Amino acid sequence: MLGRDIESDWIGNYWGRDHSLALNTFSKMSIEKEGVLYQKDFFVPYDGLVEELPEHSIEIPEIMGQDLLNDRLNSVEDVQSSYYGRLMPGLNIDLSMPTFPVSNELPVRLSSPIQMNLSTSMPNPTIEQLHSKTKSYVSQNPVNMVGSLSGSPPTDCHSPGGNSNTCGTLKTRALSLSPVSSDTAAKKKSPSRSGSSSSGIKRPLNSFMLYRRDKQSSIPTNNHQSISRIIGEMWKRETIEEKERYAEMAQRERERHAKEYPDYKFLPRKKKDRSTSGKSPRRRKTFDPSLEQDESKVLRMMLNQISHKKSQSDAEKFKLDQYSWLLSEEGNYDSQKGAFDIICQANTNSSQTGLPHSNQPSEISFIPGIYTAPNSVPLPIFPVKNKVEKVDTHNSLDGYLHTFDNLSDYEFRSLINNHSTPSVNDSRLGTSFNKSCTDSPQSISIYDDIKNLDIFSEKKETPNVSLVPTFDSTIFQDDSAYGYDNFTGIWDDPSYRLPVF
């Protein structure tokens, strides 16, 4: 029986030989009969049966015995119900029986390193007193608590066998449980992006960043480098109205940012020296043909959307200004309207494919100082070259002009709309009509840009021709450093050569 393994010192301290199974308890019961307080010892084994031990009686005065019994009943009742249920769940005790622990210490040894040295003047502490005693002990010994949480036995730093290094480690752990200071939290939240200043406040977005934020979701790719390159090309070819709209949005963003952060000042962070930090420089990514091919497809698709949107906006703008140049002078309205019909008829007849080239193309001027090409496409202004290798100017010009005959209306508009189109009042030297001559006249001016050389060379393999613009005509320069005018009617002899200085 488990009761035989119990050692007693008859003072109140009872310990089991196997402390992990120390579930047996020893209690005393006091019964008052006719002014005499009788005490009986009861042993409560693991199975919950009460075994009565030989009784012995102690005579106590009536008043003193009654007070002692009441104090014990009030102090032990809560401890009896909560303590056994918490520490010994397997123990089933009938609380209706008067079994009260009266020992000076707890009946079961705790495996926790916290040892409570209770005073003999308080034989049966209440639950509140136990909690207050535990809190005071933990506040006085935080190092032992940390050791108990980590699973290691407590170590006395002042004992001869105590290790100073261990105590220092435990103290450090105890200090780490303290709340983090505000300065440390602010350092952890320091900005790591280039768009933030040293104060942690982000800079206001500019017009391009706002444009990128809106267009990023419409690009069907997940590569950030490709997205950046595609949006950069889209931004370069975006319409002026669209760029102005995003510029206004950026201005409102700056005003909002200034109101929200009035004391904000951008302070860029200093770049770390790679030689001192020891980090290797960033490696360049290898070329991926499939990625470049997908990127080019997406770029073409997005640019087509931009060009289509640009052509629609231009069509709306021209629809509002339709025939406004004819109504500028009321007295010349009839003559200008008739000249407009004549030029459309001439251009329609001359733009038919398969017609032989004529050395004397039709030249019709309905506004003083304006000359027009046979198919109403203005000639580009190329930069002057020092030498052009074997260029047949007549055939080359004819090849350039007939290149537009093979274009559809949509391709013709896309080609023309890629360039800036000032109004008629700004430049009268570039007035032209659409290919079929069904819409209102459009003013197109192709500026002096080296990129314009690729416009015609992509359609037909013909060498580029350097042209020198003049007020009256266009002078072609050949490899012999002589030039002559291509348009007949100004000089009767087309072979007349004008020296170029």
Swiss-Prot record:
Composition bias, Basic and acidic residues: 246-263
Annotated InterPro entries: HMG_box_dom, HMG_box_dom_sf, SOX/SOX-like_TF
UniProt organism field: Pneumocystis carinii
GO cellular component: nucleus
Pfam families to which the protein is assigned, alphabetical: HMG_box
Main localisation: nucleus
Chain residue ranges for the region called Disordered: 142-205, 246-293
Record-linked PANTHER family: FI18025P1
Record-level Gene Ontology MF annotations: DNA binding; DNA-binding transcription factor activity, RNA polymerase II-specific; RNA polymerase II cis-regulatory region sequence-specific DNA binding
Localization: Nucleus
Listed Low complexity bias regions: 192-204
Modification note: Phosphorylated by MAPK2.
Name of the protein: HMG-box protein STE11
Record's compositionally biased regions (Polar residues): 142-153
Any one Gene Ontology BP term: pheromone-dependent signal transduction involved in conjugation with cellular fusion
Top-level taxon: Eukaryota
